[in-house]
Every structure is written in structure tokens, then in C-alpha cells.
Amino acid sequence: MSTVITLSEEEKSKYLNELFEFLKLPSVSADSKFSKYMNTTANWLSNELLKSGCDSTKIYETNGHPIVYGEKIINPSYPTILVYGHYDVQPPDPLELWNSPPFEPIIKKTDIHPE
């Protein structure tokens, strides 16, 4: 049983590190001073999709911010499932209202606070 608990803790740590890496990316789409981070975040997501088992990914450039597409075909006869989401976040202003630096996630008790 202790081996299972050790492995579970190792996996938890690994996944938390990956999540925190993502939460640290200041992908604020509404503020042009963060635009380079939108590209950084798109690339990060594309790589994570591949690591998670997607067969392929593509980043589509647009007049705005990039679109990240990932595909996993298990069987062409199966129905297509679309997962649509966004990877941008709200602007951190006003900074004086934050209890800790924005884009520096912390764990309080059992909750993750991406602040």
C-alpha cells in the first residue's frame, strides 16, 4: 500500500507542477502588452496536447490570438467529440487588490489559488 501512496504523491506533484506552469502564463488577451504570452501559452497547450496523447496539433494564426487544435483519432467510424475552451485570463489590474502576485499560484489548505 505504501508504494501506491508514494506513486500517487509523485503523480500528484507532477500534475500540480504542470498545472502551475500553465497558471503562471499571463495569457491576458484583453491587454496588448501581454500578446506575446498568448503565443507562448498556445505553444505550451499544443505541446501538452501531444504529451497527453493527441496524434497531432496545429496552431492557427488569426487576426487576433492563435487557435490551438488537437486531434486524437481512435477509430474513424466513431463520432467526433469537440471540446472548446479558452486559454486567456482576466487582466490582473488593479494589482493592489491582490493578496499575492498574480500568475503565482499557491495552495491554501486544499484549494489552488492562481494569484
Give, region by region, the residue ranges found by the protein language model.
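Short secondary-structure boundary micro-motifs
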Residues: 4-6, 11-12, 42-43, 54-56, ...
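Homeobox/homeodomain signature
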Residues: 9-18, 58, 77, 93-95
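A non-catalytic alpha/beta surface segment that caps or lines the substrate-entry region
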Residues: 30-78, 82, 104
